[in-house]
């Protein structure tokens, strides 16, 4: 018993020691886990801070100029700016004009910018932006209106009245605006083709080639609302039977071709929506008739912007790319007709209408090439489209067509627009535009006066800045001789432009003669010890790269 007590005491002490060791281990583990938790939290917080980009890191083009936040639903307006959709709607509702003042007349979804923003957010592990609701947008615009006093805006009716006074002549016209001049349904693609002077350019270009207007008397105006017959046509357009759809399309095509007032009454949101769904039909006859109907509807000036805003341009571009031959003819006519409206020019370029037109101007039928060329002429009146044409390689292609005598008159009209723009002018100089124009002028007996005048207009545009590069290229191509001929025997406007180009070139010749005829005292020059300054003087430039003394 005495021996067992010490053993029991040892066992108790040992168990207490084990408990204390276990307790200390638990405390140490708990402490380590706390450190791990705190470290993980700090690291996660730091990583989250790193993943959330600041406003300075967000690309400026992703931010709405009005709200200053990342755009969830960006749209592009006629002036070329991109905004959040809700902000634009609020501005139009409240009559607010931000700075710089944009053009909100045409609103197009900017899908490319939207996808770019989402891709950027995914790469940065940043949540994509949510669309701004209308209430928040109006609250934001009201706050901006309080800061910026607004001038009294002219109402829409007043704008239309003022514009009508400016546009309409004082004489009474008996024909519609779209009936100013009939263009032929074919053209001669050789170098002998006849092109009207630039003063009559717009008279050539008021109708697509695929439209032929019948001779008819004055037609009574229809009611603005759809009649029961028109409602029946709309019902047939939505039918599941192809025969009924074709019957309705042929009927609408005939009505809108004869009755001008029906173009307005039938150009409603419901009708355009039904036509839009039929453009991509797999039946060629349906596609042809739909595009023909759109040609007729687009002839009315008030319908042009409405048709573009309906979103019908992208499917038309698809037809230009892969539709039937006849459908391509009509689609080119629709694009040309819509491009006559200034508000549509930027939108058509943004939606990708330039590239298929450039393709069809070379390989399409005569009607397609004709309307494609005139569509490109009107679209190239906008600077943003001229920049796109340069990127698409249009300058080299168009100059090649001029050299080969293909559609030379219509192509020169496009090149005149390109030569007048500082964005596209360098591309013309790089691609041999000066030499090409002088070469056409040398074919004096083969080209008509309009073609010669267009060539001189291109040279005049290229000489606008009076750069040494143009002067050198013109002198190398011996342009002076051909311009002198135009100055003596050309039309009055061609004479004036040729005279101005010659003044630029003659100034270059006089400068060169002055340098060549200058007497130089070489002995005095060598004794002066200032050779570098004399070298700069001899070079005719203010500074010289190799100006070190020798």
From Swiss-Prot:
Keywords: Repeat, Transferase, Ubl conjugation pathway. It catalyses: S-ubiquitinyl-[E2 ubiquitin-conjugating enzyme]-L-cysteine + [acceptor protein]-L-lysine = [E2 ubiquitin-conjugating enzyme]-L-cysteine + N(6)-ubiquitinyl-[acceptor protein]-L-lysine. Residues 19-55 are annotated as: Disordered. GO terms for biological process: protein ubiquitination. ARM repeats lie at residues 260-299, 301-340, 342-381, 383-420, 422-464. Pathway: Protein modification; protein ubiquitination. It is an enzyme of class 2 (transferase). It comes from the Eukaryota. Residues 19-29 have a biased composition (Basic and acidic residues). Disulfide bonds: none annotated. One of its GO terms (molecular function) is ubiquitin protein ligase activity. The keyword Magnesium does not apply. Residues 57-127 form the U-box domain. Its EC number is 2.3.2.27. Functions as an E3 ubiquitin ligase. This is U-box domain-containing protein 40. It comes from Arabidopsis thaliana.
